[in-house]
Amino acid sequence: MIDENGNEVSGTSGFDTELALEFYRQLVRIRVFDRKAVSLQRQGRIGTYAPFEGQEAAQIGSAMALEESDWMFPTYRDHGAALAFGHSMRNVLLFWNGRNEGCIPPEGKNIFPPGIPIATQIPHAAGAAYAEKRKGTKKAAIVYFGDGATSEGDFHEGLNFASIVKAPVVFFNQNNQYAISVPLSKQMNTKTIAQKSLAYDIPGVRVDGNDVFAVYRETKKALERAREGGGPTLIEAVTWRYGAHTTADDPAKYRDQQESSVLRGKIDPILRMERWLKNKDLYDENWAKRAESEAAAEIDLAIAEMEAYPPADPADIFDHVFAELIWPLKEQKEKYLSQLGGA
């Protein structure tokens, strides 16, 4: 809807000023968070972290299209979307600090714990959406995944099941061009990910993942279609991951870093939004700086809350595997705790 210079391509008349400014505020908010989280990991204050810088428009545009009671199934790289959907910033940081409390969403929010194994959350989302259909609600689900996930069996099983039962789910792919170090050209022979929808007779949409307006519009349309009984949609949001796969990765070993540098100046979602606001005479530098400083203050408070959290109970590693503790785990737990007591 808007090009790299912030010029309107297909018109943004359906978006009011308040929503556009909120897009920008949220884009800035999650980028500030992402950069701070990388810094925290480098300082040893959280564990290995998966940055999402460059993918902000895909996450904000899709998350803000959801209704309050909808379901969200994120991956380990979609904490920006989770934050935009109302997840607690403290709990997101607790997750990256290795705490199970970080998987708990705010009261009334249907946010699944981040999917770490690739694509496993896709059948979960199809099932949750089907359950809402069976209950007769108007709730829909969105599930996030990367390009690499489309090579997994769970991707195909989830789409196949959702297609058969017409589950109200949006399969939201963020095509950031790399599955860790494997470029898209070595992952698949299809020209697009969106065309994979043809095998399941569901709509497939390819959208500029760095255009927050376009992402919001297409996700909103897919969710509305799902609520009205039209079934699932596959959305491919074409974007770019600027940084490493995780903070344990060195992207310089497998791709030209100059390419990322060039793309940052050309397709960056925040720069694009900023240019659009300027073209519309809506950009206020003082307001933009305030949005950034407010985000930084929110993050600092969340960090303080995370670091003040009581120490983890070592027994937790045994208590959340099965609904009821089975005897081998019970024995292991008792042995482990006795060893801790004697240390």
What do the PLM-derived regions correspond to, one by one?
Residues 76, 237-239, 321:
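A general secondary-structure junction signal
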Residues 119-308:
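Glycine-rich ThDP/TPP pyrophosphate-binding loop and its adjacent helix/strand module
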Residues 58, 83, 180, 215, ...:
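Short secondary-structure boundary/hinge segments and terminal tails
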Residues 32-35, 39-167, 183-189, 194, ...:
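Cofactor-binding active-site loop characterized by glycine-rich and histidine/acidic residues
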Residues 5, 76, 173-176:
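Short, histidine-centered active-site or binding-site loop motifs used for metal coordination
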